[in-house]
Amino acid sequence: MVTPKQIDFSSCVGADNSNGTLSHRRSPRNIPSSKRAASVAEEETMKKKMKMKKKKKKLDPPLIVRIWNEEDELSILKGLVDYRAKTGFNPKIDWDAFCSFLGSSIVERFSKDQVLSKIRKLKRRFHVHSEKINQGNDPKFTRSSDSEAFGFSSMIWGQGDDDGMDKEHEVNGNGAAENRTNESGEEMLKEHEEEVANTELLNENGAAKTTENGTSSGKERHDEDNDDDDELCAVQDAFEAVMSQGLSGYQKKLQLEKLMNLGNGKRRELSDEWKALCVEETRFNIKKLRFSAKLAEAANDS
């Protein structure tokens, strides 16, 4: 009788292990080790993401930044003029009622304290400009809206009315609040001089060169250059305000070049005369605005 031939599979699939299972099967111990590796990698990734988020939060700027612009300042000044006309020009202002009167364009973006702080700054700025004008100096408006803002301010504080703001925000009785006001006014007066405060011609050792009489030659030269630039700007401003209308581009260029090449004496004469006219015009506009305020007050009283 033929017995079946036993086939040996060991040559094809390898030898059996001690448990009788095929050697090509994976050990169950390999599965948890791979899961642990994946888990560790995932934890490292999460830690990196958390660190990045924390770092980003530190670097991110504040979400809400309150910035006043020219339109906001004019809105407040116009609002004060209208509110005073509505309340019969009462010198004592109810600031809570005024903030409600301003409307959502300001109130929704700024708090009452921010509004009052801005009004105090506008009031100080007006008094600084008024003092310079009364002394016969140019107020030097740096923005296009400064002249308009000064007009509204003169209607509010030009008569010297006490709006109660300074007393309401006094800090103590030793004059601390008053000192801050004076310091702020002095800072405004000096803000146009700070840019040229320390510009002197230096020698090789880093010291300012001095002349025989002990004065700084660099400072004198710098002052002369500033005077020349100021005179040129004044003459150019006068030309654009008085003569340039109706001229072609070429005519403007030709005549302006001639004015820029004038001698120092003639140029200084024209510059001084134009500055004097500007001061007179500013004073006239102030008087006109004050008269407008009186006229509006009389119309509301009758």
Curated annotation (Swiss-Prot):
Q: Which residues carry this modification: Phosphoserine?
A: S27
Q: Which GO terms describe its cellular component?
A: nucleolus
Stretches of Polar residues bias are at 208-217
UniProtKB keywords: DNA-binding, Nucleus, Phosphoprotein, Plant defense, Transcription, Transcription regulation
* Region span, Non-canonical leucine-zipper: 270-291
How changing G263A affects the protein?
No effect on dimerization
Q: InterPro entries from the entry? A: GEBP (IPR007592), GeBP-like_DBD (IPR053932)
A Pfam family of this chain: GeBP-like_DBD
UniProt key word Thylakoid:
no
Disruption phenotype annotation: No visible phenotype.
Impact upon substituting L256A? No effect on dimerization
According to the record, the residues making up region (Disordered) are 1-55, 158-229
The subcellular localization recorded is: Nucleus, Nucleolus; Nucleus
Tell me which tissues or organs this protein is expressed in.
Expressed in the apical meristem and young leaf primordia. Not detected in emerging or mature leaves. Detected in the vascular tissues of cotyledons and leaves, in hydathodes and at the base of flowers and siliques, but not in roots.
Q: What mutagenesis or variant effect is reported for L277A?
A: Loss of dinerization
Q: What induces it?
A: Up-regulated by KNAT1. Not regulated by gibberellins.
Q: Does the keyword Phosphoprotein apply?
A: yes
Annotated GO MF terms: cis-regulatory region sequence-specific DNA binding; DNA-binding transcription factor activity; kinase binding; transcription cis-regulatory region binding
| Compositional bias of kind Basic and acidic residues | 180-195
Record's function text: DNA-binding protein, which specifically recognizes the GL1 enhancer sequence. May be involved in leaf initiation. May play redundant roles with GPL1 and GPL2 in cytokinin responses by regulating the transcript levels of type-A ARR response genes. Involved in stress responses. Plays a repressive role in cell expansion by counteracting the positive role of CPR5 in this process, but does not regulate cell proliferation or endoreduplication. May play a role in plant defense.
Additional information: Overexpression of GEBP results in a reduced plant growth, a delay in flowering, a reduced anthocyanin accumulation, a delayed senescence and an enhanced resistance toward a virulent strain of the biotrophic oomycete pathogen H.arabidopsidis.
The name this protein goes by in its record: GLABROUS1 enhancer-binding protein
- The protein's organism comes out as Arabidopsis thaliana
* Annotated gene: GEBP
